[in-house]
Regions:
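Bacterial N-terminal signal peptides
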Residues: 4-14
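Electrostatic cytochrome c docking/interface patches
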Residues: 14-29
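Gly/Gly-Pro-rich "capping" loops immediately C-terminal to redox-active cysteine motifs
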Residues: 27, 42-72
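The canonical Cys-X-X-Cys-His
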Residues: 30-41, 110
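Protein kinase-like catalytic domain
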Residues: 37-38, 77, 118
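Long, charge-enriched, surface-exposed interaction segments in small proteins/subunits
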Residues: 65-80, 85
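C-terminal capping alpha-helices of c-type cytochrome domains
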Residues: 87-123
Length: 123
């Protein structure tokens, strides 16, 4: 219930769209947390299963590709293992999945990194 409420607040209050992040710190966040499932340009060549690469998501023809990055923590499967530190949301973890615990600032840094990659990849 709390997770759903936070998701709604973040989505409709514009939380995810006010970026003042550091792209290098965002790359570090992606390397630490995202590459276990997704391919990060210049970092790893393999992700898991059907997890799309960061490059493929950025180069997507979908018009909402950036919004999906902004709210990734609310999109499946992320709510089952991503915790926003400041809000201490604690999802029910499936067996064998280590939680990803990130700070609100990490979200801004991650978006700065995505925006930097997009400048190159979406030319």
């Amino acid at each position: 219930m709390l997770r759903a409420a936070l998701t709604i607040v973040f989505l409709f209050a514009g939380f995810a769209t006010c970026h003042a992040g550091d792209a290098k710190k965002g790359e570090d966040v992606a390397i630490e947390h995202c590459r276990r499932c997704h391919v990060i340009p210049g970092q790893n060549n393999m992700g898991i299963g059907i997890s799309p690469s960061i490059k493929a998501m950025i180069q997507s023809k979908a018009t909402d590709w950036r919004h999906k990055f902004e709210v990734f923590y609310a999109l499946r499967p992320h709510p089952s293992f991503v915790i926003i530190r400041e809000f201490r949301t604690r999802p029910e973890f499936p067996l064998g999945i280590t939680p990803v615990i990130i700070a609100v600032d990490d979200l801004d840094h991650l978006m700065a990194y995505v925006d930097l990659l997009a400048q190159e990849l979406r030319k």
